[in-house]
Amino acid sequence: NNYFNDTYQGIPIGGYNRLIEGLLEGVDTQVNTDFFADREKWEAVADKIVFTGKIDEYYDYRFVKLDYRTVRFETETIDTANYQGNAVINYTDRETPYTRVIEHKHFESFGQAVYDNPKTVISREYSTEWQDGMEPFYPINDDKNTALYQQYKQLADHETNVIFGGRLAEYKYYDMAPIIEKVLELEM
């Protein structure tokens, strides 16, 4: 029984941060930067902007704000070498208050290496309604938000120097593999 039905599953050795750092090595990038705090500057220095933030925010909520879901994590260290035997177990029943439990060591430790450390770290992920000031994670796929997104998309379709990509900019849920494939197919 598996939540994912992909033929192959995995994460890069060292994690996605290490992968992205390697991909961006030698590329002029700005991260951890509030685009909107100095928007004119960034638009002036870049021939092309890859925007992965909220599309409604990009257009200063011209129509109204889109709705999102967010998550919160509760993380704890447990005095057991192997809590659940897998990196991620998803819970879809109504009785369980969290959506998944992540046991971090299983992402890069296998076999005896799991048991070499007598403790483990787990995170429980809880889905919750998004409010201003919270980090948005997921779009809400209902008629109201889909229609509203289409209005923003019409504006985005007329942009010549901005590529809108990812969950927030395209207001679409993506798993990791499809979004990586989409990025690799991008024509800049």
What are these regions (language model features)?
Residues 135-188:
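C-terminal catalytic lobe of FAD-dependent flavoproteins
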